[in-house]
């Protein structure tokens, strides 16, 4: 009886750990914005066709959902998608200008804080071209998440950029309800530009 009780607790308490890796999707970048219909979340998946050599032209690596609040967006995603959304590998958070405004940013911070799998070392950027940024492809067909992660981490110590992490965002928001200055990204032709301001 004791063994059976332990088994039940283990299975019910494991949560997403019970979902096999092949039944998950792992967004590297999450975009958040505001539209006339409510809040927008964009999930950018890594391009597995490039990594495996298998072409899947019909698959869009960008999932976009728009609803009145973030919890509703996630609930709809979970009801409509065959794979579990695992945010534990998220590297980049990209915010449009509207969601940085008072009122919207409070809802965003509340949502992010209750997402226990999103790490505080995620880099945060802002843009007024959220759609263009998420559909941008690098020279080697890298996704936006892979590219920005590379800018931040795959450099020598003298070349590394000083990004802003989600931890810093939480800290300033807790202090005075505002957000720190965020590096800006935009698309110029085939290039993705990043402005780190005085932190470059």
Per-region residue spans from a language model:
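Membrane-proximal alpha-helical signals and transmembrane carboxylates
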Residues: 2-200
């Amino acid at each position: 009886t004791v063994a059976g009780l332990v088994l039940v607790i283990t299975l019910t308490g494991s949560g997403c750990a019970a979902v096999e890796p092949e039944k998950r999707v792992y967004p590297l970048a999450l975009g958040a914005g505001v539209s006339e219909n409510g809040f927008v979340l964009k999930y950018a998946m890594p391009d597995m066709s490039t990594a495996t050599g298998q072409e899947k032209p019909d698959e869009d690596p960008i999932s976009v959902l728009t609803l009145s609040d973030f919890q509703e967006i996630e609930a709809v995603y979970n009801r409509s998608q065959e794979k579990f959304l695992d945010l534990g590998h998220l590297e980049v958070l990209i915010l449009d200008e509207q969601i940085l405004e008072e009122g919207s940013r409070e809802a965003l911070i509340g949502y992010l804080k209750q997402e226990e799998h999103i790490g505080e070392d995620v880099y945060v950027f802002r843009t007024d071209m959220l759609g263009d940024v998420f559909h941008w492809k690098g020279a080697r067909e890298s996704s936006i998440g892979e590219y920005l992660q590379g800018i931040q981490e795959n450099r020598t110590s003298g070349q590394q950029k000083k990004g802003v992490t989600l931890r810093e965002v939480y800290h300033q928001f807790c202090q005075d309800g505002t957000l720190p200055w965020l590096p800006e990204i935009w698309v110029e032709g085939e290039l993705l530009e990043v402005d780190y301001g005085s932190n470059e």
